[in-house]
Amino acid sequence: MPRVDPTSARAVLHRFGAFADGFADCFGRTVQRTAASQYIEGLFNDSERKSMQAMHGRLSDPVTYQALQHFITHSPWRASVVWDRLRTTLPVREGLLAIDDTGLPKQGRHSVGVQRQYCGAKGKIASCQVAVSSVLIAADLTWPVACELYVPQGWCEDDARRTAVGLPPSVRFREKWRIAVAQVRLLLKAGFTFRAVLADADYGTNGAFRRALERLGLRYGVAIRGNLQLW
């Protein structure tokens, strides 16, 4: 790896700190704000594994491991508020919108939504979580603008499992295409404009998804499966 001189490193850390400070009031307590900043730092550090223990061990000025773990697993804060704030920081509001699944390899049974399903990160069926994500493409750059965890139907209908992981009663099964359309509507309401919506065949083959985009007055460029019948 190329060496980074101390002056450049300090400048990057200063810019990162200023960026993270812009989200401070999304969290109600000081310990949450500190843990949030350090969790982001952990995602950027050089630990090969992004487990809590690996990230915590490389933090420059760490909170306790228990505090960092509690922030992710039990601390009450709303991801939607963080996403709203992130969208306000973007320097562009117009471009192409790319919708896709994001596969997160994950073992075990106690992470919400984990099961054997197609994982793009591995290119095969594997134990993972899947999120529906929307990315704005503009000026040769990509900007994440929405993301929501897909909770499979089996999870939503298993009361014991829901209780064990604290899945809120408001979470009900929604197909991925419905999550994607909800994200598009949210982004339009937030003032974004799209030259077109892009998606792979998992979305493009679904007629209900395409019709929803048409009703919103949006152009789209989507892949379809070779066995799709049109008339």
Locate each region found by the language model.
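An internal, acidic/charged active-site-proximal segment
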Residues: 160-231
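Short, contiguous clusters of charged residues that form electrostatic/catalytic patches at enzyme active sites
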Residues: 38, 129-132, 178-185
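Active-site-proximal, Lys/Arg-enriched surface segment
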Residues: 71-153, 158
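Basic, low-complexity segments
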Residues: 1-27
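Electropositive nucleic-acid engagement tracts
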Residues: 27, 31-109, 219-221, 229
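Gly-rich Lys/Arg/Thr-decorated short loops/hinges at beta-loop-alpha junctions or inter-strand turns
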Residues: 63-67, 156-167
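Short, charged/polar micro-motifs that form catalytic or ligand-binding hotspots
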Residues: 26, 41-45, 58, 120-121, ...
